[in-house]
């Protein structure tokens, strides 16, 4: 699959490395072209780095691996995203990571859909720490990625990506369910960083 990763932070780098390693065609876009190029070179597997618009132009799926506050500028830089799958992996959290800045009546994925009304926005990967994106870091455990979106075809593409790097993609319903998934992501941050569990934790829905 042709995937653009927008952002060179821990989540962007982790997803880019995992997806490129799984055989996907990965392009990395960032405002800092040198960082994008350096990350692509480090990852290898044919990954390329450049500006945001160039990365998006050659991709079918675009991963917005950015803080929620940076989304508007990134989408403006992306150019035409009509018909493309936009994966929102963000949690709209405060600077101290301790609370959501929006939620329940609106949510990050909905605001991104407003910014890109012709794109197919899907919420996913927001409950996974960057340290668990590399398949070997999970030590054989299969973690779940909750996938919410309004287009079944878009969700299927995201599930395929998740499966290709060793996750279990779980259909979490329409995009509006992101308002429930985002608090799960925030709770995971609390478990990891404020309750002493560390970043090797992730929520899993178990049917009994």
Regions found by a protein language model. Give the residues of each.
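Rossmann-like NAD(P)-binding element
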Residues: 44-46, 52-96
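Rossmann-fold NAD(P)-binding glycine/threonine-rich loop
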Residues: 90-137
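NAD(P)+-binding Rossmann beta1-loop-alpha1 motif at the extreme N-terminus of oxidoreductases
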Residues: 1-45
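Active-site-lining helix/loop region of Rossmann-like oxidoreductase modules
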Residues: 143-208
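Short, well-ordered alpha-helix to beta-strand connector turns
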Residues: 23, 59-60, 119
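General beta-strand structural signal in soluble alpha/beta enzymes
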Residues: 49, 120-125, 169-172
């Amino acid at each position: 699959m042709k995937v653009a990763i927008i952002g060179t932070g821990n989540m962007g780098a982790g997803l880019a490395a995992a997806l490129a390693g799984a055989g996907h065609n990965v392009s990395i876009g960032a405002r800092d072209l040198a960082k994008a190029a350096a990350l692509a070179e480090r990852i290898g597997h044919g990954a390329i780095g450049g500006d945001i618009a160039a990365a998006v132009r050659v991709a079918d799926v675009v991963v917005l691996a950015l803080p929620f506050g940076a989304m508007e500028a990134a989408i403006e830089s992306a150019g035409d995203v009509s018909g493309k799958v936009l994966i929102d992996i963000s949690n709209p959290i405060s600077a101290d990571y301790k609370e959501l800045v929006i939620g329940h009546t609106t949510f990050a994925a909905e605001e991104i859909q407003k910014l890109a009304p012709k794109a197919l926005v899907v919420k996913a990967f927001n409950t996974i720490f960057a340290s668990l994106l590399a398949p070997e870091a999970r030590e054989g455990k299969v973690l779940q990625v909750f996938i919410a979106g309004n287009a079944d075809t878009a969700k299927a593409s995201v599930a395929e990506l998740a499966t290709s790097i060793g996750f279990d993609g779980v259909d979490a319903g329409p995009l509006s369910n992101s308002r429930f998934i985002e608090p799960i992501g925030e709770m995971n941050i609390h478990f990891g960083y404020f309750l002493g569990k560390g970043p090797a934790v992730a929520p899993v829905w178990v049917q009994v």
